[in-house]
């Protein structure tokens, strides 16, 4: 676990042209949101993994089930796997954002090293790319 820096000096937090500088309240609001999200995702992930284990245990190869029942169970299992993987990804992104806050690299685009933007981060605290780089990524 990395040591936290002094958060009273926020000069390390970049902003885009025309944006107000970060305040301690802004930073604490983002940190609080990320911590709450981490807690929620951790609980969701634990529940999803238990549900998935139950589905795997209940799926006995379909003996005695007709093909519609078997297909329904397979679909349900695949949906639960998708939800579980999505939760894992969101949790990893949330952890990464918290690490970047502690390392004082939060708010810097991981691609072009320009500011991600205060407004973007307040709307989507897990963002690691500025809007321009995110759009380029999505076009690929």
Q: Where do the language-model regions lie?
A:
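Residue-level signature of catalytic and energy-coupling elements of molecular machines
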Residues: 34, 112, 121
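Short functional micro-motifs and their immediate structural scaffolds
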Residues: 116-117, 138
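Short linker/helix segments within small regulatory modules
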Residues: 120-126
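Topology signature of small-to-medium multi-pass alpha-helical membrane proteins
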Residues: 123, 138-139
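Residues immediately within or flanking Cys/His clusters that coordinate Zn2+
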Residues: 88, 106, 127
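Cysteine-rich micro-motifs
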Residues: 127-135
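Interaction interfaces in information-processing and related assembly proteins
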Residues: 2-103
């Amino acid at each position: 676990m990395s040591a936290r820096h002094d958060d009273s000096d926020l000069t390390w937090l970049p902003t885009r042209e025309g944006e107000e500088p970060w305040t301690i309240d802004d930073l604490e609001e983002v940190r609080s949101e990320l911590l709450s999200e981490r807690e929620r995702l951790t609980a969701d992930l634990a529940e999803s993994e238990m549900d998935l284990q139950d589905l795997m245990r209940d799926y006995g190869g379909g003996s005695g089930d007709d093909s519609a029942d078997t297909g329904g169970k397979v679909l349900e299992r695949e949906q639960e796997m998708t939800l579980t993987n999505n939760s894992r990804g969101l949790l990893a992104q949330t952890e990464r954002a918290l690490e970047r806050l502690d390392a004082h690299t939060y708010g810097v685009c991981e691609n072009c090293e320009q500011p991600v933007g205060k407004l973007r981060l307040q709307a989507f605290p897990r963002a690691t790319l500025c809007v321009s780089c995110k759009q380029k990524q999505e076009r690929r």
